[in-house]
Amino acid sequence: MKLDLWFLVPGPSGGTILLGADGGLPTVQVEGSETEAAVIAVAAYLRDAWGLAAPVLETHPKWKEVGEGEPIPTLVLTEPARAAWTPPPGLAFAPVPATPGEVPWPIRPRADELLAELRGNTPPPELRPRWMRRGWFDRASTWMRTASSDAGRPLTGDPRPFFLRGISALLRAPTDGPDLFLKAVFPPFHAEPVLTRLLAERFPETVPTVVAVEPDEGWLIVEDIGSAWVGDVPEADRPAALARGARALVGLQRAMAPDDGARRTLLDAGAPHRPLADLVASVAAAIGPDGFGVGDGGIQPERARRVVEAVGAAVARVEAVGLPESVVHGDFHSGNAAIVDDRIVIIDWSDAAISNPAIDLVTWIAWSRDRQAEIDAATDAWLDAWSGAVDGEALRAVVDEVLIVGAAYQIVSYDGIRRNLEPATRYTMTGGGDHFLKTLEAILDRREAAV
């Protein structure tokens, strides 16, 4: 994918920014990811073409506003360049302009906003994550080097940005063995490092090994597992892989369910408690006029009423089956589980909570879309894995309700995520809640059509 990059590079002295001879922002087109991994191509260009080592604070790719195949307008903000750096020919530092000039319209509002901050030397807003603030990259890189060395895994090269978005950031660095990743998470996911370490200690076959954590910063270092994601295996093999993934998560959940002490440890470490009993009120708020679960401003009252009533009925039927509360993943999809040797390894426990494990099925089949063989294999394996802990036939009878409560849970999750993002970056998490609302309503429509 072609990225149409527009740069905001502050000068080493305050009140200046890198500009072209025409007074506009520097711009170039490069090949790269159109989403949160755009930072890889951006950092490589700055490093290799300009010799600029200033950390990238933000990439702002607006992929939804352009047609398929068109270059993605992407605004880039860096830390100030060092005084010893020499700009490329045709570029020079000049006073911060009042406007960004002729930039593509999708990135114009963000360019105006960031230029105003630079002109006024104002601090970033409260909701801007730490990795989009000056000094974070050097601090995180220094800790990554020290912590990795202390763990017996010294780095053999510099950490480089791998992923950058409002809810998380990743740095990647080489070692004599597999690469290491430093993951940083935003405040609602602040407990992920400690939770992941606790789960990895209890379930080393299913959760990646944690090399180090920094709880106050919300950092963890994990090893690159270097294997194929379940969602990337050949389509003919995917039903079996999805079945294995379902069994792996349920096995972990069944082991945790009777262990009150282990669940209490997770809660004490910061895992939220999200009982199904709270789901009806939470989803009503998430799709209401002040909600962020399905875009801004909610949905029509009559439509919302139908959804809330359906969620209430589904909660009652699912709770009657008696699935025990346990740790839930919260974002269990086929891009968060890998086949490593002969086992399934589940990553990205950002959304982990203590709740009813019914909520994890809907995401596990979401990426299969209309591939019914995959959906059936994953669903059957999930149901079979819970049989014995509960009445398997009773659980199978409420599969629709399981999917409804899972979809509602996701809408509430997206509401919490989006309201904790800086407004200008909420677009990066728009659409997820809408997808699960459609999933929920499709079940209701199918049932009504069958009557």
Predicted regions and their residues:
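A cross-family kinase active-site recognition segment
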Residues: 235-302, 323-325, 353-354, 426-432, ...
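Active-site activation/catalytic loop segments of kinase-like enzymes and analogous catalytic loops
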Residues: 357-390, 403-424, 434-439
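Active-site acidic catalytic loop and adjacent metal/ATP-binding pocket
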Residues: 19, 160-176, 181-182, 210, ...
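A short coil-to-beta-strand element that immediately follows conserved catalytic motifs
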Residues: 52-62, 154-160
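Juxta-kinase regulatory segment immediately upstream of eukaryotic protein kinase catalytic domains
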Residues: 101-159
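Active-site catalytic-loop/activation-segment of kinase and kinase-like phosphoryl-transfer enzymes
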Residues: 116-136, 140, 266-317, 444-448
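ATP-binding pocket architecture of kinase catalytic cores
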Residues: 24-27, 60-101, 160-270
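Conserved Nudix-box catalytic region and its N-terminal flanking loop in Nudix hydrolases
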Residues: 2, 11-53, 61
